[in-house]
Amino acid sequence: MYLKFAWLSFRIVAMALEAHGVDYPSSSFGSARRWKYHVFLSFRGEDTRRSFTDHLFCALQRTGIKAFRDDEELERGEVIKPSLLQAIEESLSAIVVISPNYASSTWCLEELSKILHFKKESGLHVFTIFYGVDPSDVRHQRGSFAEAFKKHEDKLPQDKTKVQDWRDALEEVANLSGWHSDYR
């Protein structure tokens, strides 16, 4: 099921990139700004790494779209790696795969904040895939999303602004047009 959805997602992303004037794989790298990657993949590893995201990554690579995905798991309490932030900055677009546990990861939320920052600052193209979640639950932060933010607020009582920034980022990306898979 997710292989079929990954392929469909790839085709839609490829068409969207072309619609935005991105002629992959070569000409976008020859533009005034040097892009290292066509696509940065943001996803919650425990939800999709060994399934949907792997299939999507392979489908992108097979057709010449250079994609970045982080293959390492971040230990609890670690900060987001500078190399990850650099990969976001060096990407022409980002695909954010929102899954049930995405908001439970402060790392994913930090990534998302940076992705949306570069969307505003440098025109990064952002595409959202709702994988196994209802887009309305993401937008209104219900269910697992409400639970995740409650935990963040409890763990970071001194940093309410950061948690609110993450909430705002998740709401913003949920309001972008995207693709929905109800695969659960």
How should each PLM-predicted stretch be described?
Residues 1-93:
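Conserved N-terminal substructure of TIR/SEFIR domains
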Residues 16, 58-62, 70-73, 79-183:
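Cross-kingdom TIR/SEFIR domain
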